[in-house]
Amino acid sequence: MIDFGNFYSLIAKNHLSHWLETLPAQIANWQREQQHGLFKQWSNTVEFLPEIKPYRLDLLHSVTAESEEPLSTGQIKRIETLMRNLMPWRKGPFSLYGVNIDTEWCSDWKWDRVLPHLSDLTGRTILDVGCGSGYHMWRMIGAGAHLAVGIDPTQLFLCQFEAVRKLLGNDQRAHLLPLGIEQLPALKAFDTVFSMGVLYHRRSPLEHLWQLKDQLVNEGELVLETLVIDGDENTVLVPGDRYAQMRNVYFIPSALALKNWLKKCGFVDIRIVDVCVTTTEEQRRTEWMVTESLSDFLDPHDPSKTVEGYPAPKRAVLIARKP
C-alpha cells in the first residue's frame, strides 16, 4: 500500500499546511473508491523492490543511481523484471544500478530546452501538473528545488514514481499525488508551477490557466509547455475526432495566441522561449514502451502531417509571472 503519511507530516510543518484541510479526505476517498483494477498488482511490484541507498546519485544531469559495489547479476535481473512489470514507461530515461529504462520520450531533451530559461530553482517549492512518472520532478530536485510536488491521476504513473523513489533511497524531496488540478484548492503556495503536455487535453484551456495561477504565490513563475501550430495571435486549431490518434485533444493555439491567453488570465512578463517540432528520435517505441508511438501517428507519405492531415506535433515553451 502506498502511504502518503510522510507527505502529510512534511507539509504540516511548512506553508502548505492549509492543504491538510482537504487533502487527506481526498486521498482516502481515492483509496476507497477510485483505484484501478491493476493497482494492487502495481503497488505489490513496488513493495517487492529492494530499498537501496545510492552511493552515487546524479539528478542534475540525469536520473542516475549507482551502488558502491556493483549489484550481482541476480539483483539487477530482479530489479529489471519488477520494473518491466510497470510497463509502459513513457517519460524518462532512468539509469538505476545497471538497469537502463529507455522510455518512449527522451524527457531529458525537453528539460534541456526548458532549464536555461527558468528562474533559479534553488530552495523553491514546485508544483508539476500532469507530472507522469515524475522524471522532471527529480530533475527539479537536481537543479536545487527544496520540494517538488507532482499531481497526475494516472495510477500507473504513481506506482512508477514510487518504484523509482524506492530505488533512490526513499528520497522524500519529491512526492506524487493521484489528483487532477481541478481537485486542488487555490493554494497560492508554489514558487514555480509547471504544466507540460497538459493544456491541449483540457476542454477549457483558459480555465486551466486560471487554475495554474491559483497555485502560484505572488511573483511566482509559470512554465507552460504545450502543442502549438503556426499562425498569428488569432490562430487556433480545433481538431476533429482525433489529433495524432489522440481523442482528447481540444485546442491547439499558435504560440502568439497562447501568449494572449496568458495575458487575458492576468499573467505578465510572458515569454516564448522555445518552439520545436517533435521528432521520432525524441518520441519513439522502445523495449520499455512497445505499443504505437509518434511514427505511427504521422502520415507515412508526408511526416509534416499527422495521419488525420493536421500539422505534425510542434511544441512551445512559454514562461510567465503571476504579479
From Swiss-Prot:
Top-rank EC class of the record's enzyme: transferase
Enzyme Commission number(s): 2.5.1.-
UniProt-listed Pfam families: Methyltransf_9 (PF08003)
Reaction(s) this enzyme catalyzes, per UniProt: carboxy-S-adenosyl-L-methionine + 5-hydroxyuridine(34) in tRNA = 5-carboxymethoxyuridine(34) in tRNA + S-adenosyl-L-homocysteine + H(+)
Residue ranges crossing the lipid bilayer per the database entry: none
Binding site for carboxy-S-adenosyl-L-methionine: 91, 105, 110, 130, 152-154, 181-182, 196, 200, 315
GO BP term, example: tRNA wobble uridine modification
GO MF term set: transferase activity, transferring alkyl or aryl (other than methyl) groups
Superkingdom assignment: Bacteria
InterPro entries linked to this entry: CmoB (IPR010017), Mo5U34_MeTrfas-like (IPR027555), SAM-dependent_MTases_sf (IPR029063)
Keywords noted in UniProt: Transferase, tRNA processing
Function statement: Catalyzes carboxymethyl transfer from carboxy-S-adenosyl-L-methionine (Cx-SAM) to 5-hydroxyuridine (ho5U) to form 5-carboxymethoxyuridine (cmo5U) at position 34 in tRNAs.
Membership in a protein family: Belongs to the class I-like SAM-binding methyltransferase superfamily. CmoB family.
NCBIfam families (UniProt xref): PRK15068.1, tRNA 5-methoxyuridine(34)/uridine 5-oxyacetic acid(34) synthase CmoB
Subunit field text: Homotetramer.
Name of the molecule in the record: tRNA U34 carboxymethyltransferase
Species this chain originates from: Shigella flexneri
Gene: cmoB
